[in-house]
Amino acid sequence: MGAYKYVAEMERRKQSDVLRFLLRVRCWEYRQLNVIHRASRPSRPDKARRLGYKAKQGYVIYRVRVRRGNRKRPAPKGATFGKPVNQGINQLKFQRSLRSTAEERVARRCGGLRILNSYWITKTVSTSTLKSSLSTPSTRLSVVMPVSTGSATPYTSAENLAVSHPLGKQNRGLGRGSKHTKSPNHAFWKRTNKLFLRRYR
């Protein structure tokens, strides 16, 4: 077996003494850093390479920390606009994953880069840390590579989430096979053309 096989096997056993110690040290280290910061190299090189990262010019790695748990609805200065004060505030469930949120924040920070993919590193009680790999579309090297083909113009953060990287496809239900035959177009039309008179926010 090659070295990456051993690394991948070690990452699978998260209850082992080695990995429990490593995750504890990583949690402490990442808490001292900014919420979004650039990493010099991937924490899991085998996983990063599987997801399209290459250790060459034009590819960068960013580490992101995202808060876990429910999404709290903002009610500035307690302005509830005639609705009950405590209803529909705390127990809202965000429809997208933490990974999607992390990728969106990195895309907003690095407007000239394109998201390739991301993977989980560690989590604490209140936060989850993920790593995103990005490529530079304007670099000749990465434009030539088939992994990151496309025009050399930078994306907006919304386009970055909608392009054909795996999470963007998953969120929009794109793909081939029997799971992807039922189009969400009618449901989208119905949702956007219906009048909602909600008692609670």
Curated annotation (Swiss-Prot):
GO terms for molecular function: mRNA binding; structural constituent of ribosome. GO terms for biological process: cytoplasmic translation. Keywords: Ribonucleoprotein, Ribosomal protein. It comes from the Eukaryota. Pfam families: Ribosomal_L15e. GO terms for cellular component: cytosolic large ribosomal subunit. InterPro entries: Rbsml_eL15_core_dom_sf, Ribosomal_eL15, Ribosomal_eL15_CS, Ribosomal_uL23/eL15/eS24_sf. Belongs to the eukaryotic ribosomal protein eL15 family. This is Large ribosomal subunit protein eL15. It comes from Quercus suber (Cork oak).
